[in-house]
Design a protein with these regions (language model features):
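Single conserved hydrophobic/aromatic residue that forms the stacking wall/gate
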Residues: 1-2, 168-179
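Short, solvent-exposed amphipathic alpha-helices that sit
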Residues: 3-6, 87-91, 150-158
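Hydrophobic, Leu/Ile/Phe/Ala-enriched alpha-helical segments that form helix-helix packing faces
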Residues: 3-10, 96, 127, 158
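Short beta-strand elements in bilobed, periplasmic/extracellular small-molecule ligand-binding domains
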Residues: 6-23, 102-108, 164-167
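Long alpha-helical, hydrophobic tracts
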Residues: 16-29, 151-153, 157-160, 171, ...
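Cofactor- and metal-binding active-site motifs of prokaryotic enzymes
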Residues: 20-134, 145-146
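Charge-patterned, long linear interaction tracts outside catalytic cores
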Residues: 127-167, 171
Length: 179
């Protein structure tokens, strides 16, 4: 119910994966489905009592940026009107950190369909930037001695983003001509 409300509320293009992730096999089916639909960024929606471990592994296995958000409890019966999606979001963020996985988590990741639609709109430029940078190819000029930290440290962050780096050593021309 909640996913459909989010899709209806969000103004942009949004593919709704029909697979509900309850275990690792479901996670694999969901990834197969979104890859088949040629999605290059994901919003992983944590409902109440969701299995955070398989949902967290999506970030590990998907080749693109992922954002994690969670359902707000609406009945007001829980403490401060908050239900189990908030707890699941905490478990998810802990799981991501333990596994050294990168994912985007909004400042307030638990919300209603309207809130989450806004979070998705805010995520789109982040996802575009991550996709653009990770597809970037940089050609640097050297030589850069491998043990000279000051030369190599600035590119570590680029490697972590998946940027392809090629180093061209500039030395003597192999064949020089004078005309």
């Amino acid at each position: 119910m909640y996913k459909r409300q989010i899709k209806e509320t969000y103004k942009g293009e949004l593919y709704e994966c029909p697979v509900t992730v309850e275990n690792e096999k479901d996670m694999e089916k969901a990834l197969e489905d979104v890859n088949k639909a040629e999605c290059n960024a994901l919003v992983v929606f944590l409902g109440n009592f969701g299995p955070e471990t398989p949902e967290t592994l999506i970030a590990e296995r998907f080749d693109g940026p992922c954002m994690y958000v969670a359902a707000a409890e609406g009945d007001g019966d829980m403490i401060n009107g908050r239900g189990d999606a908030y707890c699941g979001m905490l478990n998810c963020s802990y799981n991501l950190k333990m596994r050294h996985l990168k994912a985007y988590i909004p400042e307030y990741p638990v919300g209603t369909a309207d809130d989450i639609a806004k979070m998705i709109a805010d995520f789109v430029p982040v996802a575009r930037a991550v996709i653009g940078v990770s597809n970037l190819k940089i050609i640097t000029f050297g030589p850069r001695p491998q043990d000279f930290f000051a030369c190599n440290a600035p590119i570590k962050g680029l490697y972590e983003l998946g940027v392809e780096l090629s180093l061209i050593h500039i030395s003597e021309p192999t064949r020089l001509a004078l005309i």
